[in-house]
Amino acid sequence: MCIRDSIYIVDPFIEKAFPERHQNLWQAKEMARIIGTRGYVVDVVDYMNRNAKLKFNYDMVVGLIPRGIDIYTKHMNPGCLRIAYLTSMNLAITTGNEKIRLDELKQRRGIELSPRRGSSTVIGKEIEQFDGAWYIGNKYNFHSYDCFKMPPSFRIVNSGYAFDWAKENIERDSKSFVFFASSGQVHKGLDLLLELFSQHLKDYTLYVCSGYEQEEDFYQEYHKELYETSNIIPMGFVDIESETFREISYKCTFAILPSCAEGCAGSILTAMSAGMIPIVSKECGFEDDEVINLPDCKMETIFGYVVEYSQKDQNWLKNAAKHSMEIVHSRYSKLCFSHSVEKALDGVLANTK
């Protein structure tokens, strides 16, 4: 049997030694390995490659949708199993939520910025005909697909890290926060944090670790907050294997991410792995006993949570840091990811016998 696996990317299969700059690099290889243990020959295609020249017909296709499946339409054997891999909330919801954030920004500052995370291509009713769906996130985020009659669906657990240098029992600055994200600064809520920390939280420190420099309109609009505000430290992209990231994790008590849509925020798992306490929107995909979930992302709500939790005593903060690391170890380890993929794969196979 053959399976075409277009779940993520081909980089980790090509590079002999690849840095774990993102969870999906290791996860892609591990997913292919697990599928191979069920008797399949696994091929891998980057989900962004729309011109892949396929040589075989396949008995199973696992891919991101709507982008990751259509190129296989003419290369499926009769009875080919189709599994949708959902790494975020419903794209229609994601796009709508980002638009709300951009509209709110326009009302506040009179500037219209470009969307970064939304998509004009959304998932359609065809997903109802799939043999299974694998999703990263929790039930709250998976409910964004309630508009569909979903096929048998299985949760895939995102994975954190086991940093051998991470420390739980150290005294960090309770007024130091880190924003740790990738692209889509408004989507992730950086605009809200920059305005809050520059105007209302001047005695707090915010480290900004993200790709804001690659978003020219955002970069220009928030240049003053980023580069002319003493309590905001612009770091840009930070390699999680670097000494810089380690130093930030020893300084900052909290990681904060008021995102409008996620699957299960990998950057927050990374921060938790390093001993930081997460304050996040419920859209980040965590349960209430795992993180500090914001009830909403209004400015006054974020402000209140920042102030409230920064006033906790050091004993509470150290216990919370320890709890963050324990949650990653017990619920979001690499082993947890592997077990969830095995369970999801076997679940689809069992339902189609």
Describe each PLM feature range:
Residues 1-3:
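Short, small-residue-biased leader/transition segments that mark boundaries at the very start
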Residues 219-239:
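Nucleotide-activated donor-binding/catalytic signature segment of Leloir-type glycosyltransferases, i.e.
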Residues 113-153, 162, 217:
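A short, active-site helix/loop in glycosyltransferases that binds the activated sugar's phosphate group
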Residues 276-280:
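Short hydrophobic beta-strand element within catalytic cores of glycosyltransferases
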Residues 165-188, 194-201, 207:
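Conserved donor-binding/catalytic core segment of Leloir-type glycosyltransferases
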Residues 23-26, 311-346, 352:
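A charged, aromatic-enriched C-terminal amphipathic alpha-helix characteristic of glycosyltransferases
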Residues 260:
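Aromatic "clamp/platform" in nucleotide-sugar-dependent glycosyltransferases that forms part
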